[in-house]
């Protein structure tokens, strides 16, 4: 376990140059309780946009899903600083049990917040696998056929040429929320 003083010592040592670290990790398999950070930035309305990602990963996790988590934190910071300008609220949620639990975290949230989601959630943006090194195409998937043209126009600023057409939605990510008729984009 690394506490504050050990962390400060590591930072001091890093100032002298690169370090080699050896980790010893114990893994257990089974059903466990986990935390699921959720933050609400209040706008003028109770209506909200849900921005979600997952914090569990396989392997190193930088691409899936560390970069998206960092982007979500930065979005939350910027929205918080500008909250007086928000027409709608923004809810940020980091799911547990996504990769290993087959979307258990988002399913739990949906089950426990269904009425609020059905009544007030106007859109769900799922951030997953953002910022792949060496990528030259930014793609999208959406449940909003009427929004496909908007997404395509938006992505023109990131891609050379025309973006690929949206890929049809199959079971992955967090389509858990479709039952509440919430438009979804990834």
Regions found by a protein language model. Name each.
Residues 1-2, 7-8, 44-46, 95-186:
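Metal-dependent peptidase/peptidase-like ectodomains
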Residues 1-63, 74-89, 111:
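Soluble metallo-hydrolase cores and metallopeptidase-like ectodomains found primarily
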Residues 15-19, 30, 70-74, 102-105, ...:
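A short linear-motif detector with a strong N-terminal bias
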Residues 22-24, 93, 185:
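General small-molecule cofactor/ligand-binding pocket signal
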Residues 27, 36, 72-73, 127, ...:
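Detector for methionine-enriched segments
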Residues 49-55, 63-79, 88-97, 102-106, ...:
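Extended, hydrophobic alpha-helical segments in both membrane/secreted and soluble proteins
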Residues 57, 68, 142-145:
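Active/binding-pocket-proximal capping segment
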Residues 61-65, 137-139:
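Short, solvent-exposed loop/turn segments at secondary-structure boundaries
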């Amino acid at each position: 376990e690394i506490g504050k003083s050990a962390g400060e010592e590591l930072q001091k040592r890093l100032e002298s140059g690169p370090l080699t670290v050896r980790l010893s990790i114990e893994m257990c398999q089974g059903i466990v309780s986990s935390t699921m950070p959720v933050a609400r930035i209040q706008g003028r309305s109770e209506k909200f946009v849900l921005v979600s990602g997952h914090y569990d990963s396989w392997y190193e996790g930088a691409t899936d899903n560390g970069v998206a988590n960092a982007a979500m934190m930065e979005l939350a910071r910027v929205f918080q600083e500008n909250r007086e300008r928000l027409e709608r609220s923004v809810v940020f949620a980091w799911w547990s049990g996504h990769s290993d639990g087959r979307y258990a975290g988002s399913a739990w949230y949906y089950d426990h917040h269904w009425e609020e989601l059905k009544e007030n959630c106007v859109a769900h943006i799922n951030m997953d696998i953002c910022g792949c090194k060496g990528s030259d195409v930014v793609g999208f998937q959406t449940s909003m056929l009427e929004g496909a043209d908007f997404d395509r126009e938006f992505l023109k600023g990131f891609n050379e040429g025309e973006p690929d057409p949206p890929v049809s939605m199959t079971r992955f990510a967090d389509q858990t929320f479709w039952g509440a008729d919430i438009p979804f984009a990834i």
